[in-house]
Amino acid sequence: SERILRMNQLPYKALHVSGKDHAGYYPGATDMTLKLLFDPNTGKIYGAQGVGKKGVDKRIDILATAIKGNLTVFDLPELEFTYAPPFGSAKDPVNMLGYAALNLIEGLSDNIQWYQLEEELASGKKFLDVRTSGEFQSGRLKVDTIHIPLNELRERLDELDKNQAYIVSCHSGLRSYIAERILKQAGFTVQNLDGAYSLYKMANPKGVEYGN
């Protein structure tokens, strides 16, 4: 756990990835969220957790075997699994954990965890939500928020301040990563809320408000 890693003063990064238990276009796909702890210097995998209705045990078994075999996060994107739409996706959530970990290691992304958000905002950073207007109206974090949908972001960069640091979020993390890349390439200082709205809502339901 993160607590044990901190107690032992081990360098680590945490990340969360959301995905489906099998191909999303095939009927019956259900959501899962996987958490990975790893050494950002060596890629060593410390541990993993998962929640979901189906298929979580399979992914944790894979990651437990990877740890036993001394695989690192650098190996995860290249792992190949049995594929058929009722049983898996062309890119499995385990592969996506690897890609997300490499983005952190290579400096393409910088994340914060849900429990760090309050402190980061108190330090002066601003919160940017890039979900659609419909998603934003349905539910949002109880924090001061700048709302710019991702498909409008490039045209509305002048509404943001390059002297201001931002924390960006979407529903599950993919769009906020894209927004993070757009903003960094434009000269902004940005971090990504790991797991985004879906994880925050699950971990801190009292921190979310619903409706108009």
PLM regions and their residue ranges:
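Mid-to-C-terminal Rossmann-like scaffold of FAD/NAD(P)H-dependent oxidoreductases
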Residues: 1-46, 50-51, 89, 93-119
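Surface-exposed charge patches
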Residues: 3-7, 64, 134, 181
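Short, conserved beta-strand edge motifs with alternating hydrophobic and charged residues
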Residues: 15-16, 127-130
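Anionic group-transfer/hydrolysis microenvironments
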Residues: 41, 131-133
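Conserved residues at beta->alpha junctions
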Residues: 50, 54, 170
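A short, polar/charged loop-to-alpha-helix boundary motif
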Residues: 53-73
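Rhodanese-like catalytic fold shared by cysteine-dependent sulfurtransferases
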Residues: 74-126, 133-166, 171-212
